[in-house]
């Protein structure tokens, strides 16, 4: 049995962690790989951090492509081979499915929120949906649990005012945009969030403070509303609508 009380103590995502612990105990009893629903980045970060030191249980995560934000967790006994970092484009045994949502959105453009709303409106729960990739005028692609593909093909027929057709595609057919890498060197007097983020995103510090105070800024997937919050090497900073950056290293000047 897992030390549930200790693992749950002080957890921010207590309900999510409790469900994952249930799955972990199931994996220990059955000697099978057990998969969670899709989790958000902060949920994944907390679960992995709290389960990291368990010698009897191993945890992996996969969302359909390397940069996926929403992912499913795989749990298995430490004696069971578990590697979700399969290099094949469509690894077998990983319960993820990709769908194409095709329509003509030239005169009624749809956003990520529109496609998510249409999926939820069709009757699918949020935790059954992974990342959604908007393709402009032609529609979108989404990653979902495999058991919902046929249901969505029948029940998702419209996004905004646009009729759509849903079909299954291979994970290797996802239109993944490779992450854009740009090196930025900046000399800052401190590692305050507002100072580092304003330099990284190329906007004024006062504007960055406003973004932070509005809750638009996340550090390592957690919303931060204090401009004076201290960041460090390897931290991710994301701003809604602007993208994300990672602090590669911090060098002291003399």
What do these predicted ranges mean?
Residues 1-200, 223, 236, 243-254:
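Ferredoxin-like alpha/beta domains used as RNA- or RNAP-binding modules
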């Amino acid at each position: 049995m897992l030390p549930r009380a200790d693992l749950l103590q002080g957890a921010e995502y207590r309900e999510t962690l409790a469900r994952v612990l249930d799955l972990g105990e199931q994996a220990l009893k059955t000697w099978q790989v057990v998969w969670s629903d899709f989790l958000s980045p902060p949920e994944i970060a907390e679960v992995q951090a709290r389960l990291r030191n368990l010698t009897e249980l191993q945890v992996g995560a996969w969302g359909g492509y390397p940069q996926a934000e929403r992912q499913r967790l795989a749990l298995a006994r430490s004696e069971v081979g578990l590697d979700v970092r399969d290099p094949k484009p469509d690894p077998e045994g990983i319960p993820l499915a990709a769908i194409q949502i095709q329509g003509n959105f030239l005169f009624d453009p749809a956003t990520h929120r529109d496609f998510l709303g249409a999926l939820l409106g069709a009757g699918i729960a949020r935790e059954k949906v992974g990342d959604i990739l908007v393709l402009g005028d032609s529609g979108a692609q989404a990653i979902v649990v495999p058991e919902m593909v046929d249901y969505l093909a029948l029940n998702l027929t419209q996004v905004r005012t646009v009729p759509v057709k849903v079909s299954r595609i291979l994970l290797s057919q996802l239109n993944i945009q490779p992450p854009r890498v740009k090196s930025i060197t900046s000399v800052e007097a401190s590692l305050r969030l507002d100072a580092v983020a304003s330099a990284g995103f190329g906007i004024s510090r006062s504007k960055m403070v406003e973004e932070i105070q509005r809750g638009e800024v996340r550090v390592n997937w957690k919303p931060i509303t204090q401009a004076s919050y201290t960041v460090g090497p390897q931290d991710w900073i994301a701003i809604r609508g602007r993208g994300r950056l990672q602090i590669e290293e911090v060098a002291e000047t003399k």
